């Protein structure tokens, strides 16, 4: 995935070599302990560059540690972006979270994924489509793709960006119509979208099955497995 990122996309990353990103100072690690917005995998190794999951929560309370325990305890470093200030650019907290993780932890700079929940999923789509070279993929858990916002302006780059939309089966008619329009849009544009539909979620429209699929889908991308562009349905 090298070459997909732009130096402008993640501020500061372009100023550091891959070796510097792979070997953060061990003395810095204790600063992260007890930070609820940071998740370190079990058996964290500073010499291995981990995929980074950047979480954008929805309006409801969010527990990063609990979410990651259902995604994977070993595969990823994860950070939670702070809520943007009123009227501020929704992407700014994301860049700040990425900068902080890349400067202090062992993160692979070409394996950064956005994962959003609810409205956070819609924002994840917005941010990733506006800066598609900055990310290896984007996942939305229950947040529909923002239609009619010209998010395919950089279509050549967007076509290379894998996206996953996880939706509840019991969605209302309006949500179902939006999903249908989204599939048509992606098909016409030749962009990559995997759609997976699940039984009713446990809480906040997010189920254990959704979170387990986040792990599988991201690791498929990390390991080079091709994600089919057709819709996929989970039961």
Which residues fall in each region the model found?
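Loop/turn elements at helix/coil->beta-strand transitions in domains of secreted/extracellular proteins
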Residues: 49-51, 74-77, 109-111, 133-137, ...
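Gly/Ser-rich "nucleophile elbow"/oxyanion-hole loop immediately N-terminal to the catalytic nucleophile
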Residues: 42-48, 88-119
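The feature captures the conserved acid-bearing segment of alpha/beta-hydrolase catalytic domains
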Residues: 142-222
